[in-house]
Amino acid sequence: MTIEDLPDFPLEGNPLFGRYPFIFSASDTPVIFSISAAPMPSDCEFSFFDPNDASCQEILFDPKTSVSELFAILRQWVPQVQQNIDIIGNEILKRGCNVNDRDGLTDMTLLHYTCKSGAHGIGDVETAVKFATQLIDLGADISLRSRWTNMNALHYAAYFDVPELIRVILKTSKPKDVDATCSDFNFGTALHIAAYNLCAGAVKCLLEQGANPAFRNDKGQIPADVVPDPVDMPLEMADAAATAKEIKQMLLDAVPLSCNISKAMLPNYDHVTGKAMLTSLGLKLGDRVVIAGQKVGTLRFCGTTEFASGQWAGIELDEPEGKNNGSVGKVQYFKCAPKYGIFAPLSKISKAKGRRKNITHTPSTKAAVPLIRSQKIDVAHVTSKVNTGLMTSKKDSASESTLSLPPGEELKTVTEKDVALLGSVSSCSSTSSLEHRQSYPKKQNAISSNKKTMSKSPSLSSRASAGLNSSATSTANNSRCEGELRLGERVLVVGQRLGTIRFFGTTNFAPGYWYGIELEKPHGKNDGSVGGVQYFSCSPRYGIFAPPSRVQRVTDSLDTLSEISSNKQNHSYPGFRRSFSTTSASSQKEINRRNAFSKSKAALRRSWSSTPTAGGIEGSVKLHEGSQVLLTSSNEMGTVRYVGPTDFASGIWLGLELRSAKGKNDGSVGDKRYFTCKPNHGVLVRPSRVTYRGINGSKLVDENC
């Protein structure tokens, strides 16, 4: 029933009747009040309602202020409102409302709002407990659910980690109510909700009140299964990792021994000494190490910690790119300067290589590349996965047919194969990459000048064949890489920035091999130099360095590269291989080669990859609720919860639920709710502010939503 469905009541004698005749005394039937905006004083200097302000108090206590307007005030997620839940709630009750009446926008009752108002840092727990007790004494139904979230009062109290309210609610409930499920959380219980959101106080309280720690949700998970893994958390979330470890252990200890909890238990290496772990990895304290192939430093600590389970490494970085000074949560594990300390799982560190120290870098690319020779491997017995049209039945004939190709035709074969392959080079050995680059011109010269001499050398012939049959070579030699990128190629960096490769080799600023890219727009970091060493030359802010795993080709073939219009070249391209154009003329040999490659690489294709049309791939994919996107302004991942128009601005907007509390709201702006999420996890942005797999969000929404 809504407020419009109510019958007529006698209005005489009630001072509240006048402008709002729907207000009546002591209604026995709960109603849903229509949506209204929060009233604000005309001379108000702030954007929210403050019950402590004199002008706001005048509106609050005015009998003409409607219940809908009072509910609108309760929706404001600010301390000034939430800490005065009892004052605003009593004003609603004074207007003759039923204690179970609902807000038309959120479908929440006063008890639901009270459970939210107990959130630490926003509301006041003591006030919320007193008012919740008052509401329950007046007949508030604790089993009522919001039809938007399907959450009842217990679920809200668990979600916002208010154990004091959990005790009040369960005091008058039935024993089974403690395990009431919620569809928005995979039909898990309040214990699942508290565990997933790392609400340690709520978890402890629910267990004390008899919540079932072995209850399984629709995915077959017990509460211990839904606790976020501390190892997957960013290092700056050390406190959250410690809480996760505590909750996990608390839940596992509460599970009956007869329950199979093998899936819930994490591998525990706490009993293994740090020295033993380091020895097994070939490391020792004081060694130079690399973290995830990026940051370099000195190993200062290895062992168990208070903030997470398992063995952790403490590293003093070379640059102030860390998170701490060697301490986390008031526990000092090692000492270093502020911002130079960082902790990482042992699986993320490796010993730094010292080979780059003897290299002198110059603007010349050749001078920056060391001469490294790999072992000569006979690959004549290996059958190529790609049909290149070369004879491979005999070793001599294979070498002869390979070397008898004209230089131009050999180059064409390599180029077509390289372009057809997916532009991923993350698994390629840097040694083989350099050898391939340096030996290729030599092989060309030798072919044109003295074919007979080369054909007599089995090892050299094998290497020449390997240059044309890289898929066969990669089977025999893991250091050879398919689809190798070359200087001068247009590439995509981190799925977003377009540029041209100007440098490849080792650097002084980090171990391993790096690409130096000249970007097409001034979105870079430098002019081709880092730390006083010039690796290549370009305009300021046009240069950037990236590891091979972050660089990929822009297009599928050199034939289509020249046909791409300038506006398409500025688009962001996703990291998957597009299909070949069916309109291009191909020989039977090329078709066979492509089919063979397609079968061997089918796992690398995206399920939504298709032949590009005039509108590109953007036309086949649209953002929808549940899509995972990147908010570029804060580099935060989020889930799309709303796509459509808003009341505060024209056009299409996206409602995002961020993974961390770096948002602006809980899914509502002003007086309107667009979606529901945790406080400070919600944000509404233009589609152009997000990217989806490297594609700008503005290309993935329908303006007619």
Swiss-Prot record:
Q: Where is this region: Disordered?
A: 391-410, 431-479
- Entry keyword Repeat: yes
Q: Which GO terms describe its molecular function?
A: microtubule plus-end binding
Q: Which UniProt keywords apply?
A: ANK repeat, Phosphoprotein, Repeat
Which is one Pfam family of this protein?
A: CAP_GLY
SUPFAM superfamilies the UniProt entry points to: Ankyrin repeat (SSF48403), Cap-Gly domain (SSF74924)
Domain CAP-Gly spans what residues?
303-345, 505-547, 644-686
PTM sites of type Phosphoserine: S557, S609
Ranges of Polar residues composition bias in the record: 441-452
Q: Which GO terms describe its biological process?
A: cytoplasmic microtubule organization
InterPro entries to which the protein is assigned, alphabetical: Ankyrin_rpt, Ankyrin_rpt-contain_sf, CAP-Gly_dom_sf, CAP-Gly_domain
Write out the ranges of the repeats annotated as ANK.
65-101, 149-180, 186-215
Any one annotated GO CC term? intracellular membrane-bounded organelle
Q: What name goes with this protein?
A: CAP-Gly domain-containing linker protein 4
* Biological source species: Homo sapiens (Human)
